[in-house]
């Protein structure tokens, strides 16, 4: 009767190592690194800014969970899960201001666009990719600058005062020009008046001159007195009518 052959020790060891290698390779098959820009990204207040992020090695990230949040309280800036943007989980200050650019998501590359940048957006952002239970992330720094950061306070004061000074100078020059022209016209009219003066003017009766001067002055005054008396009588009549019929 032939005896059964037993497996040798080297063959068992090789099988064990091969099985271990398969397990290790399968466990590390889904691992990747998340890479973001090394230098801070700069943006001006009111502009748009784009925060790029990718995984290495590149792979299709359509089925992954991708998002941005802000430390230290993990406020959700934008979240992409199950192939859709989860707008309901955004922090209130970012609702309606973010957009995930997914043109290259098949290569593991995405970009977050933030519209209407505010000073409060300055600081750190964290981009993460999650594939099942495995997650990696990268930090991104955003610097927000004022469009007039190059202007010193003294220049701002000068820019505010300069238009007023220019307006005053312009008005003054216009006034001087008009005054000079009016003086010339007045001088010419006086000279013409002296040339065309009629000595018979003094023979006009004094009552006509008085009437010509007083009527334009007293006319409006008399009309005002008449209107006042009419209004006074009307109000007095209404008051008496109310006294007679109180209800």
UniProtKB/Swiss-Prot annotation:
Localization, UniProt: Membrane
Entry keyword set: Cell adhesion, Disulfide bond, Glycoprotein, Immunoglobulin domain, Membrane, Signal, Transmembrane, Transmembrane helix
Membrane topology: Multi-pass membrane protein
Glycan-linked positions: 60
Domain of life: Eukaryota
Signal sequence coordinates: 1-29
Cytoplasmic side: 176-210
Extracellular side, ranges: 30-154, 232-247
Subunit structure, as described in the record: Homodimer.
UniProt name for this protein: Myelin-oligodendrocyte glycoprotein
Species annotation: Macaca fascicularis
């Amino acid at each position: 009767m032939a005896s059964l052959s037993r497996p040798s020790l080297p063959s068992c060891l090789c099988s064990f190592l091969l099985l271990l290698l398969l397990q290790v390779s399968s466990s590390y098959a889904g691992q990747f690194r998340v890479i973001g820009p090394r230098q801070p990204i700069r943006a001006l207040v009111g502009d748009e800014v784009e925060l790029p992020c990718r995984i290495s090695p590149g792979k299709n990230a359509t089925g992954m969970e991708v998002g941005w949040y802000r430390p230290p309280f993990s406020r959700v800036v934008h979240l992409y899960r199950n192939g859709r943007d989860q707008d309901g989980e955004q922090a209130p200050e970012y609702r309606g201001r973010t957009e995930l650019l997914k043109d290259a998501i098949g290569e593991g590359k995405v970009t977050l666009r933030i519209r209407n940048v505010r000073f409060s957006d300055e600081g750190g952002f964290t981009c993460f990719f999650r594939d099942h239970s495995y997650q990696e992330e990268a930090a991104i720094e955003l610097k927000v600058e004022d469009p007039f950061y190059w202007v010193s306070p003294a220049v701002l004061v000068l820019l505010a005062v300069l238009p007023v000074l220019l307006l005053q100078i312009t008005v003054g020059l216009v006034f001087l020009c008009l005054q000079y022209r009016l003086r010339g016209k007045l001088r010419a009219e006086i000279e013409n008046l002296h040339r065309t003066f009629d000595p018979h003017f003094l023979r006009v009766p004094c009552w006509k001159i008085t009437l010509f001067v007083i009527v334009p002055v007293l006319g409006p005054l008399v009309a005002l007195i008449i209107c006042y008396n009419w209004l006074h009588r009307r109000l007095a009549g209404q008051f008496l009518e109310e006294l007679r019929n109180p209800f």
